[in-house]
Amino acid sequence: MDSGSPYHWLRELRYDSHGSNPMIPLIECAKCVASGSIKTADIGLEYISQISSPHGNGVQRMVTYFSEALGYKIVKHLPGVYKALNSSKISLSSDDILVQKYFYDLCPFLKFSYLITNQAIIESMEREKVVHIIDLHCSEPAQWINLIQTLKKRPGGPPFLKITGINEKKEALEQMSFHLTTEAGILDFPLQFNPIISKLEDVDFENLPVKTGDAVAISSVLQLHSLLATDDEMVSSSGAASFNMQRAAHLGQRTFAEWLERDMINAYILSPDSALSPLFLGASPKMGIFLNAMRKLQPKLLVITEQESNLNGCNLTERIDRALYFYGSLFDCLESTVTRTSVERQKLESMLLGEQIKNIITCEGVDRKERHEKLEQWIQRLKMAGFVKVPLSYNGRIEATNLLQRYSHKYKFKEENDCLLVCWSDRPLFSVSAWKFR
């Protein structure tokens, strides 16, 4: 790997006991999968399984989940095999809640986001009597408990606080309601909690319990990128879509490489890096509809936290390349701050990071939800949707610095375009930006 490679930093990471770096065969294996050299990829995956481990160092753990995803990528084009491998898998609400809790506890990213979001709400709603927060993924009570405690001390008394929490998991909303109403009762705080059981893309903004006079704040933490998921076939003309169906019917007459190549071509059509495609116009109808619906609420504040990576429209090999860079930093920060024997760490890596990696590599079209984009792309998208940026609080930045230092000196943040980027060893991982209705 030359010094210009995005992987030069991996040389500093620990190798396994045999001195082998599993990153190298993984990258080669990914190229084989993308080109359709399945037998070679199979040999590579066999070798990788011998030098990687979900219980090893950070690189070994990450490579384990990337190699697993590559394996699923291969078998997904054999529908019967793929369904058989996944037929017994059950997603429990309790597991989802638990792994989010691990992410909150072991890494500072969610705490950072919540701190900055709450400070922005406090400052923008300073004189409002009725504050209505719409949480697009209501799952962590600590954020709003902290806000309730702070607003209770507001000079002149607290506002009437409404929180409309959106989550497709009923259990998550029930837990949120219990914790928030309990805290409000203890503090004698005026609170109304409105649970909305819904997928993000199905939220009916017109029927949300927003009343005239409500000062609206919207909080979106790692949610909006899922709305970038689109049907790749729909981007092509209807004639092309029909032709693809005819070609699919003759799969036996085509090579596996050709079949994979179709995925890569479709992905390129949607690429925000492509000169053939505007940044997002037409690429994601769901995103455009959703942003327009939010704008109609005329929010006084909209705070967005997103992954700082570019994994939306690129082809398979570029996607893997960029995902290795992003997730390499996440696994490294866990390796540096959490013991290898931690059960919580193992579950976080397997149930959250591993599943995200699998979605990025294995899935295409509407099934690929992990379509991260960089801050500059979100800025352009939000501006075009009719929002203007709100500078983030100085007080919030001071508190955020103290928060990050409690985890590790390698955590830091930097300012960019009136937004904040939280970093690990100078590598931006998440962005936080604040907006308002124009």
From Swiss-Prot:
Coiled coil: none annotated. PROSITE patterns: GRAS. Residues 362-436 are annotated as: SAW. One of its GO terms (cellular component) is nucleus. Induction: Accumulates in roots, in a RAM1-dependent manner, during colonization by arbuscular mycorrhizal fungi (e.g. Glomus versiforme). Its main location: nucleus. Residues 20-81 are annotated as: Leucine repeat I (LRI). Residues 216-359 are annotated as: PFYRE. Residues 175-207 are annotated as: Leucine repeat II (LRII). Keywords: Nucleus, Transcription, Transcription regulation. GO terms for biological process: regulation of DNA-templated transcription; response to symbiotic fungus. A motif (LXXLL motif) lies at residues 224-228. One of its GO terms (molecular function) is sequence-specific DNA binding. Residues 100-165 are annotated as: VHIID. It is found in: Nucleus. The keyword Transcription applies. A motif (VHIID) lies at residues 131-135. It comes from the Eukaryota. Residues 13-436 form the GRAS domain. The keyword rRNA-binding does not apply. Pfam families: GRAS. Belongs to the GRAS family. Interacts with RAM1. This is GRAS family protein TF80. It comes from Medicago truncatula.
